Regions:
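N-terminal, active-site-proximal structural segment of metallo-dependent hydrolase catalytic domains
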Residues: 2-115, 192-195, 340-354, 358-363
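Short, solvent-exposed loop/turn elements at domain surfaces
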Residues: 37-42, 177-179, 320-321
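Active-site-proximal beta-strand elements of phosphoester/diester hydrolases
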Residues: 27-39, 165-174, 197, 201-205
Length: 363
């Protein structure tokens, strides 16, 4: 498939799985890390990491089952190696539109690295583009002149029922893995080698944090510029590889201008801000129930767990805004394959929970 492509399988038809947009009052959105989605006989990262035919079919079946069960209208995918295979799979499930802006790196004709992100939609995609880095802002941030996103960000402009055009962004921010490793020297003492590796872990980890936080900053500035020019609603989804509110990425949901009491100006700012779908869902639930909600992790590593997968929304989806069209009526964290897996079914699923939300038209 060519880069920057929109793939409408049935341009003049309406998929049997899509409700008439005039009467559709709910929109379902999901973010889905596919975890090494690469069809055999190709290998991911190393020459011997290849799915058997049975493993690959199990993975394909798991993804199809999720789509059939939850029926999201728009899905942001991460860790995509086999672009054409994914496009074929989702089209069989009624997703007539598919967008991608990059392709993986291939070494020796079969070893794949640098997976990409993609978006599938049951609604028409009107435009697809890769988000470009603002080089002037890169310099102002003190970054290297050749700074780029570790993974290209997809922007797909989707035509939603009732609302119209919505710019949907799919991201997979830089991981927490240290940007470099310490060298082991056989002629150096054990203490010296341990110190070298520990220093690399600390400094390399911070380098990854700088990359991740800078990616978020440059993306948000691009989204604001686009919002100012086009006025489209905004939806940002993906694997952030970082808890949203711990500091590195917290600016993505900056709610207002500091040290400014001008209500008119603050109202203008809200047009450009993003909200965490979970926060909107929680706020809406407080209206109907006093029960305390607990946000489930989306990723487990050893004894620790964290929320790494997010969907962020603009004011059009915030029930607290009078001008909003939709509200977040449900938030689903599909994680049974992580906390209570059935090997025969979940053995080749994914190492992340799949996060989805329901957006309901406001009355």
């Amino acid at each position: 498939m060519p880069i920057n492509s929109i793939s409408p399988q049935y341009a003049d038809q309406v998929s049997s799985t899509v409700t008439d947009p005039v009467t559709q009052t709910q929109i379902k959105v999901a973010t889905f890390n596919l975890f090494n989605y690469l069809a055999p006989p190709d290998a991911f990262y190393d020459f011997d990491r290849i799915y058997s035919a049975e493993q690959w079919q199990k993975k394909e079946n798991w993804i199809a089952s999720y789509l059939q069960t939850h029926q999201p209208d728009i899905i942001g995918f991460q860790e995509v190696f086999s672009i054409e295979a994914l496009e074929t799979l989702v089209k069989k499930q009624g997703y007539d539109y598919f967008a991608v802006v990059d392709k993986p790196t291939v070494i020796d004709d079969f070893i794949h690295r640098d997976p990409v992100v993609a978006l599938a939609s049951k609604f028409p995609i009107k435009e697809v583009a890769a988000v470009e880095v603002d080089k002037d802002l890169v310099m102002q941030l003190g970054l290297s002149a050749d700074f780029e996103f570790s993974r290209q960000v997809v922007r797909a402009t989707v035509e939603l029922p009732h609302l119209g055009l919505c710019d949907c962004y799919v991201v997979h921010f830089k991981s927490k893995r240290a940007a470099w490793q310490g060298d082991v020297d056989k002629l150096t003492s054990l203490e010296g080698n341990v110190l070298s590796q520990f220093k690399a872990q600390v400094a390399g980890g911070w380098a990854s944090s700088i990359q991740r936080g800078s990616e978020a900053t440059l993306l948000l500035m691009n989204m604001m510029e686009r919002r100012a020019k086009k006025g489209n609603a905004m939806l940002l989804m993906g694997d952030f590889n970082n808890p949203l509110k711990d500091g590195i990425l917290a600016h993505l949901i900056t709610p207002s201008m500091l040290f400014n009491n001008d209500q008119a100006q603050q109202k203008l700012v809200k047009f450009y801000t993003l909200r965490d779908a979970w926060d909107l869902y929680e706020a809406n639930q407080k209206v109907v129930s006093e029960d305390t909600l607990t946000r489930a992790p989306t990723h487990y590593f050893g004894q620790s767990s964290s929320v790494l997968d997010y969907i962020l929304l603009s004011s059009e989806f915030d029930a607290a805004e009078q001008s909003s069209y939709f509200e977040v009526s449900d938030y689903i964290n599909t994680d049974k394959h992580l906390i209570n897996p059935i090997f025969e079914f979940d053995g080749e699923s994914t190492d992340h929970a799949v996060v989805s939300i329901n957006l309901t038209l406001r009355e």
